[in-house]
A protein has these predicted regions:
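Cysteine-nucleophile amide-bond enzymes
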Residues: 1-210
Length: 210
């Protein structure tokens, strides 16, 4: 038997606050992890770790991106015991989506409709909890109580078979406390770096045209 982890958070970003305003749920984001240290998380989310878009299947890290800058947000960590075969299938499916991330998009409309309990499925489009749900269901790791397009992060707090191993502030999550952080990384430095990256990208595209 092996363990798959599901991390639930409410990051306090614009999109998170919008979902929270509509649903009132404790958690608005879901991620998967395949190791006890949570060294790498997987979800359908912001691809650069900071800005809302571009978004799609992406890796997340507890000491980078939004998780680095918003450490006081509420979170809950759940453990799911699965067979070795289901674990391997879930990990293989996840890594495949990461490797072909350019083929996938973030399911913005689906996320909004999920909050209203309306099913909306579009090929290769996923929001966070839909991504987590499909990986777990299609790998045979667990059965869902409803369609993946209707699974909200908060639904995982009510599922049988999941064990809550931590609940509290993200800053107090044991795995995060063991990680190293870049002391120079601040909100200002992050967004300045992103702005410079966009500027360089724009300059390169202009050069390609001419």
């Amino acid at each position: 038997m092996k363990t798959i982890y599901i991390l639930l958070t409410r990051s306090g970003t614009l999109l998170s606050n919008l979902v929270y305003a509509v649903t009132g749920a404790n958690y608005t984001h879901a991620s998967l992890a395949f190791d006890d240290e949570l060294s790498c998380l997987y979800s359908s989310t912001r691809k650069n770790g900071y800005t809302m878009f571009p978004a799609g299947p992406s890796r997340e890290y507890l000491n980078r991106g939004v998780f680095r800058l918003r450490e006081n947000v509420p979170c809950a960590l759940y453990a799911l015991e699965v067979s070795d075969e289901a674990y391997a299938r879930a990990r293989r499916r996840t890594e495949h989506m990461m490797a072909h991330g350019r083929l996938y998009r973030f399911n913005v409309l689906g996320l909004m409709l999920c909050a209203l309990r309306i099913r909306w499925k579009r090929r290769r489009h996923y929001f966070c909890s839909q991504f987590v749900s499909e990986v777990l269901e299609k790998s045979g790791a667990m059965e869902l109580p409803k369609d993946s397009t209707l699974m909200h992060p908060n639904d995982y707090t009510k599922l049988n078979g999941l064990k809550c191993v931590f609940q509290g502030r993200l800053a107090d999550l044991p795995q995060r406390r063991q990680m190293e952080f870049d002391p120079e990384e601040t909100v200002v430095s992050v967004y300045l770096g992103l702005a410079m990256g966009l500027l360089r990208s724009g300059v390169c595209r202009v050069r390609e045209i001419f």
